Amino acid sequence: MNDEQRYKQGLEVRTEVLGEKHVNRSLENLNDFNQDFQNFISRFAWGEVWSRPGLPRHTRSLVTIAVLLALGREDELRMHLRACFNNGVTKDELKELILHCSLYAGLPASNAAMHMAEEVFKDLGIAPEKVNKD
């Protein structure tokens, strides 16, 4: 596969995972400073790594969220918390992932991710139900 084919495949995968709105916004904001970087992201991250057959996208989403949570990369984490539903991740899986990460990435990072996930859920209209504290 040549670079142009990999770029096209990357755009397709990137759109399937992150959504058309996000990818279109990135493409509309291309300029002479960021174009090479955006092309690299589409070609390498999405056309090469996310396109590999070894892990299903569902698993890739969970791994990505865990790594971003551990590294404290909040902008990317928010984006992938939003996008993971396109890959079949459930709210319960996210809850367990964040809880599990608290053991290895620390409580502050997981606490921030938990709040961020709740904000994303609210934005998507899937806010968790209130529970009775009794």
UniProtKB/Swiss-Prot annotation:
InterPro entries: 4CMD/NDH-1_regulator, AhpD-like, CMD-like, Decarb_PcaC. GO terms for biological process: beta-ketoadipate pathway. It catalyses: (R)-2-(carboxymethyl)-5-oxo-2,5-dihydro-2-furoate + H(+) = (4,5-dihydro-5-oxofuran-2-yl)-acetate + CO2. It comes from the Bacteria. The keyword Amino-acid biosynthesis does not apply. Pathway: Aromatic compound metabolism; beta-ketoadipate pathway; 5-oxo-4,5-dihydro-2-furylacetate from 3-carboxy-cis,cis-muconate: step 2/2. Its EC number is 4.1.1.44. Signal peptide: none annotated. GO terms for molecular function: 4-carboxymuconolactone decarboxylase activity; peroxiredoxin activity. Gene3D superfamilies: AhpD-like. Keywords: Aromatic hydrocarbons catabolism, Decarboxylase, Lyase. It is an enzyme of class 4 (lyase). The keyword Lyase applies. NCBIfam families: decarb_PcaC (TIGR02425). Belongs to the carboxymuconolactone decarboxylase family. This is 4-carboxymuconolactone decarboxylase. It comes from Acinetobacter baylyi (strain ATCC 33305 / BD413 / ADP1).
